């Protein structure tokens, strides 16, 4: 019997998707513009009704950077679904949805600090679940090196939303000030998406 779910799987397998590069500059500009004052075109998932707005905000940044929404297959990411607005659901999405010519959606991978660049994401996973997501908007360096300050950075600057509009909205904030341990930090390299 053909169901809507089966039809989505068939369509996903039969379709060849084209790669679209991530516009890091556009994503970063969006993050910096809306870090302190949320975009009124989207709901704010803060106190007292929700646990936080971090992943809703980083999803908006990805979308502003040209990442296409994905409503095909088991793992999906589109405006205001659970993966769009929830840190752990977003982790499950990008970690399981391996964007490729036959899989629609985000192409992202785990990375290491030295390879993180503008508009990549960083997630906090203290135990069994991701609890927070931020976007990289800058760097701190001791030396400029070989025309690649990202390579010689000792810290990155981040933008974030949280559950509290007064204290949780950060713009160009040093990641080191958050004091996350190495074990609980996941660096997410964003390559682009397949559409």
Task: Give short role names for the model-derived ranges.
Residues 55-64, 133-137, 157-160:
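Active-site scaffold segments
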Residues 3-83:
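N-terminal capping segments
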Residues 152-165, 170-195:
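Low-complexity, Gly/Ser/Thr/Pro-rich intrinsically disordered linker/tail segments
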Residues 70-74, 136-137, 171-172:
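Short, solvent-exposed loop/turn and secondary-structure capping segments
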Residues 64, 68, 140, 164:
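Short loop/turn segments at secondary-structure transitions that flank enzyme active sites
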Residues 78-158:
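...with weaker cross-activation on analogous glycine-rich loops/strands in unrelated enzymes
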Residues 1-3, 176-177:
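Low-complexity, intrinsically disordered terminal/linker segments enriched in charged
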Residues 40, 46-51, 140-154, 172-181:
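Intrinsically disordered, low-complexity coil segments
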